[in-house]
């Protein structure tokens, strides 16, 4: 096996949507970094049965603004 080809595997903190925190090991970021989840098993529609819109940092608004002129025109316009 080749040496020095594997990423650093270290401990990080994970914060769920309800504020619950736990530690796990990952190759993400640096040791001690925090991963904040937008959707987790406690809030995901597949497990809760409730649909909710998550707009992280205005991405949905930015998308709508960018493509607002590409819709189907109605007869009223």
Swiss-Prot record:
Coiled coil: none annotated. Pfam families: Ribosomal_L31. Keywords: Ribonucleoprotein, Ribosomal protein, RNA-binding, rRNA-binding. The keyword Ribosomal protein applies. It comes from the Bacteria. GO terms for cellular component: ribonucleoprotein complex; ribosome. Part of the 50S ribosomal subunit. Belongs to the bacterial ribosomal protein bL31 family. Type A subfamily. Binds the 23S rRNA. This is Large ribosomal subunit protein bL31. It comes from Paramagnetospirillum magneticum (strain ATCC 700264 / AMB-1) (Magnetospirillum magneticum). The lineage of its organism: Bacteria, Pseudomonadati, Pseudomonadota, Alphaproteobacteria, Rhodospirillales. The gene is rpmE.
């Amino acid at each position: 096996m080749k040496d020095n080809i594997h990423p650093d595997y270290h401990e990080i903190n994970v914060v769920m949507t309800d504020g619950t925190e736990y530690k796990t090991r990952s190759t993400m970021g640096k040791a001690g970094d925090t991963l904040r989840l937008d959707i987790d098993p406690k809030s995901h529609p597949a497990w809760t049965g409730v649909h909710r819109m998550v707009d992280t940092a205005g991405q949905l608004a930015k998308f709508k603004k960018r493509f607002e002129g590409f819709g189907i025109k109605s007869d009223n316009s």
